[in-house]
Amino acid sequence: MKYLHFFRSHLAGFSFAEEVFVFDQLKIWTELQLVLEPENPYDAHAVALYFKKTKIGYIPRVNNKEISKLLEAGYADLFTAKINRISPEEDPENQIGVVVFLKVKGKK
């Protein structure tokens, strides 16, 4: 499958989630699931990122408005998110880098 770059960012909220239990399992290019959280009390456009069944953080607020609208409209299958940077020595909010891609259907 071919992918088009949509945006790149750090993983927000990393220090508040359950990620400490899965940090050692995270690798470069690990695929993450994008999950819309419209009832999030802190951000109506919140998009959580999951590794397997563990929430490890969020798409930062500065990047989430467009993608949250597309997820809400039912286009979740067009996106994939992958870890592109792991820096354990950094502050928790900057330890994980994520890139979101658009999947190009029918192309390899």
Task: Show the residue positions of the predicted features.
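Conserved active-site motif detector
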Residues: 1-108
